[in-house]
């Protein structure tokens, strides 16, 4: 999903540099490895949009806890602000798991003082025919949610 966010355009819209690094199909475990090179540059903020791929094999609370572990690892590695991004709805049997994971993410963000980018404004109408990825309408909402956070 994040691969359709044009970092350069988003940066121009919010008035500062934005780098988008998509890792399609990645799980929270894989992100431990993918993030390390990016953290060497000490970014001002890291926004984590991860977890949907974990829901196929793990319970929603465990997925949220893995995201939190990743966020804590980032905080312990460099002086950066961590923001979490809600999982986006789906039109399959995992949609309820997405909602449950998002509730846990909200609680964990509150407990840790992190911001959470909400995506409840993306409905099934924002999904493609397969029901798992965003269509053009959903991509616009997704982009705008990140833009609103970064402004």
Where are these regions (language model features)?
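Catalytic nucleophile-elbow at a beta strand-turn-alpha helix junction centered on a G-D-S/GDSL motif
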Residues: 1-8
